[in-house]
Curated annotation (Swiss-Prot):
Tissue distribution: Expressed by the venom gland.
Gene3D superfamilies linked: Collagenase (Catalytic Domain), Disintegrin domain
Record domain Disintegrin: where: 396-482
Chief location of this protein within or outside the cell: secreted
Protein name: Zinc metalloproteinase-disintegrin-like cobrin
Amino acid sequence: MIQLSWSSIILESGNVNDYEVVYPQKVPALLKGGVQNPQPETKYEDTMQYEFQVNGEPVVLHLERNKGLFSEDYTETHYAPDGREITTSPPVQDHCYYHGYFQNEADSSAVISACDGLKGHFKLQGEIYFIEPLKISDSEAHAIYKDENVEEEDETPKICGVTDTTWESDEPIKKTSLLTNTPEQDRYLQAEKYIEFYMVVDNIMYRHYKRNQLVIKRKVYEMINTMNMIYRRLNFHIALIGLEIWSNINEINVQSDVKATLDLFGEWREKKLLPRKRNDNAQLLTGIDFNGTPVGLAYIGSICNPKTSAAVVQDYSKSTRMVAITMAHEMGHNLGMNHDKGFCTCGFNKCVMSTRRTKPAYQFSSCSVREHQRYLLRDRPQCILNKPLSTDIVSPPICGNYFVEVGEECDCGSPADCQSACCNATTCKLQHEAQCDSEECCEKCKFKGAGAECRAAKDDCDLPELCTGQSAECPTDVFQRNGLPCQNNGYCYNGKCPIMTNQCIALRGPGVKVSRDSCFTLNQRTRGCGLCRMEYGRKIPCAAKDVKCGRLFCKKRNSMICNCSISPRDPSYGMVEPGTKCGDGMVCSNRQCVDVKTAY
């Protein structure tokens, strides 16, 4: 039932005090000749167009199904009353979640659920609008409104629980903006990346939605669709690889202590989830009310880590988009981003990595982008580079979704977004006489010659890759062998040259050095921050020969204090990295200092 009070209306997003009623009309979409074979009948179309008015002006909204929303091996898991785990692989490719743009509006975008009318948000002429159906029988009426017209649900501030920040001051991040990347680094940052995302809904939230799994699924799908639009600007695709609903009992002790819940969820992911379902990142969506004002918490710079590539988020708002933005925020921490400082801007009042959640934010600040890029270049997480093969995509190909699928030669996005001179955005075929589009071994629409460098060696431990002259793809990245001397003071390990000094700088900033040897003897004890490793929550000290393979100790200038860095949410934070030199001809392996000749 719709309740009207003057110009106020109660919608799913809350009480809206000013809105416009529109009647979207579906119009026939132009066929994209030569791209797709005739499609079988489906409930939802791959592409749609709607006409309606915004501020009294007619607009045409083009929608394309978000092909990358689900991975090809997507599964759903719930639990029977007797505790049995039930996992299915439902057909989800005929879904109703779309991205889009407005005709003749270059800087426009849309994130829409078309399951039952049009619901979502869109950007038009620099303004963000929201649209949702008015629940009036036999009517196509929809409400369009701005976020400023939605009344606050309550006055309690909603914040992220992350308090540790790697920024000791504003100065280091400002300085990084002056640095320039190498061509190889730029190519790496611009490459498409993929996160196979696993979502868990706890039993408290399940009961809050009256045990209605369909309602929960739709809510989660809308959230992932929104996250996809947010991360597209960073060249990331978020593919939902699994949804798990704890329909019987919680599989961990979900509690009001947000940190404790995150730690337990990370352990559950590592020990219980990953052995049965691969994923790059997982989040727990809970109906519990966390203590204080936090509505989410995540580990920082941990993507691909078995335990710490995780976050927990409270389902704190009626607004699906607000919770989705919090999920995107927490994933941002996993991807190396910290909270925005006062000088960070994104063109709107609020950015995704703002500490407080008051209004929706859909863009990352310049600070977040730099911090994220710095993390990627430093850690080079591997799981995000797994690109799905076109033959793995089981649903019909869609021209304009940035995925090159069966029957396509290129895909540069929609005609409004495409910036390629080599690709026809309407047909997803190469232009006449073009051999390639935007791959590493493609230049001006032609294959680069054999021997052309397509991926430079990053450092002593990397090898350059060369084009073959027969393909637009750069060969697989290869490295120097482990144990090869590098940078005059280290040994190569998995393509990196782990040097203690560099690790100290990464932890504590420029000008930091490795502490004196006597500091490392603290690793023979378990008091303070000294240790070699953790086993079942218990600190294990180092043997005397292994002290330089435990906690890393750093100092500023001529300080005599033994400084260490710890994070209660990440046991590996501040530890000496594997492969680090711990003596002449010796390297760290499994927290032991061993001969480099036998280590690998």
